[in-house]
From Swiss-Prot:
Keywords: 4Fe-4S, Chloroplast, Iron, Iron-sulfur, Membrane, Metal-binding, NAD, NADP, Plastid, Plastoquinone, Quinone, Thylakoid, Translocase, Transport. It comes from the Eukaryota. It comes from Manihot esculenta (Cassava). Transmembrane segments: none annotated. This is NAD(P)H-quinone oxidoreductase subunit K, chloroplastic. Binds 1 [4Fe-4S] cluster.
Amino acid sequence: MNSIEFPLLDRTTQISVISTTSNDLSNWSRLSSLWPLLYGTSCCFIEFASLIGSRFDFDRYGLVPRSSPRQADLILTAGTVTMKMAPSLVRLYEQMPEPKYVIAMGACTITGGMFSTDSYSTVRGVDKLIPVDVYLPGCPPKPEAVIDAITKLRKKISREIYEDRIRSQPGKRCFTTNHKFNIERTTHTGNYDQELLYQSPSTSKIPPETFFKYKRSVSSNELVN
């Protein structure tokens, strides 16, 4: 899985020398020992938990899960991110030391998913909060897809230059875009009093005369059914 190509050594000579740069050596050490911070909020994180078992064994990639952002260089977000959780996620990312990377796992993390439809509290894409290096679509993604995302991140690390990455980091990021709440016309079915069921928000109690009027309009057979 290591994408860095090493030169072949001459076995005929007793002394062999490998020439490289400090940047390549740093990239090789970082891609071989990624320490992820697991930020799972929904069902996608269960698929990532499968990698810990012996079937996939993600330890062979040098991944060591950490519980502190100050000891992690990779944060893996999985699940829905709400507006109330957004400041906490940004704070965790800011506490991670440089260089740091982000993998967005699942449709809810990348676009908000089905929970972002006419929702005022769901962030439509975690990339509006923190910069994302690898997008992993799926609902939920399979463990094999998670391994492929980690492999792509390792290849990206092997080709990057640290100084260029620092300069390319955005200075400010917004929390989210303005959400559009579309009020659709509801479809009512059945025989019931609309005034009883759909009252104004200021009405906290049902008047007794309205309640008994509705009760008399419904027969006993309908109440049993």
